A protein has these predicted regions:
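Glycine-rich, Arg-bearing micro-motifs that act as flexible, cationic patches
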Residues: 114-136, 154-159
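Conserved acidic residues
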Residues: 16, 113, 142
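Small/aliphatic-rich secondary-structure junction motif
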Residues: 7-63, 85-89, 168-169
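Short, flexible loop segments at boundaries between secondary-structure elements
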Residues: 140-155
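Short, structured coil segments at secondary-structure junctions
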Residues: 41, 133, 141-142
Length: 169
């Protein structure tokens, strides 16, 4: 069906199928919150965790076990369902440095009309040398992509410290 355009009342786009790529549950909180704020009644949400694998010799290795990967997706699905959203999720295997292709394939197969990603974790130098997952998804996606900002570490504490009187001795 695809996203619904604004109507004459100025209502913004409404997405019916949102795919959110979850790399790490704790680091993806801003992406999860963004999805909960964008989703409306009837929106379906799919949490996708890509389990990266690499070939070493004649064997495939992964940085995480199958159960660890499933927990990441399951935790996101649980959070979406607690917010009243129709949610499902899963784990997809991807070769290291082919994660973007895994996200895009899932979006195509599921017919997502919005992809939500967290901010990249790679450093700027690494991203320039090898490219970033976020950059590749943005360049190749056939549907809109939203990149949620990184979670502000200790932002409340920073604000409290900035507003408290200082001892200037």
């Amino acid at each position: 069906m695809g996203p619904q355009p604004p109507d004459e009342s100025g209502v913004t786009w409404m997405f019916t199928k949102i795919l959110v790529a979850i790399e790490d549950f704790d680091q993806s909180q801003n992406a999860l919150e963004l999805v909960k704020n964008v989703a409306t009644d009837g929106t379906q949400v799919r949490a996708l965790h890509l389990r990266e694998r690499e070939l070493s010799g004649y064997r495939w290795y992964s940085r995480e076990s199958s159960s660890e990967a499933a927990l990441v997706a399951d935790a996101a699905v649980f959070e979406f369902r607690m917010a009243g959203l129709a949610a499902g999720g899963g784990v997809r295997h991807a070769v290291v440095d082919r994660v973007a292709e895994g996200i895009l394939a899932e979006a195509r197969e599921w017919d997502a009309d919005l992809i939500v990603l967290g901010s990249p974790r790679r450093g700027e130098v690494i991203a320039r040398l090898f490219g970033s997952v976020t950059q590749r998804v943005l360049q190749r996606s056939s549907c809109p992509v939203i990149v949620a900002p990184r979670q502000a570490r200790g932002r409340q504490e920073e604000l409290a410290a900035a507003s408290s009187p200082r001892d200037h001795g």
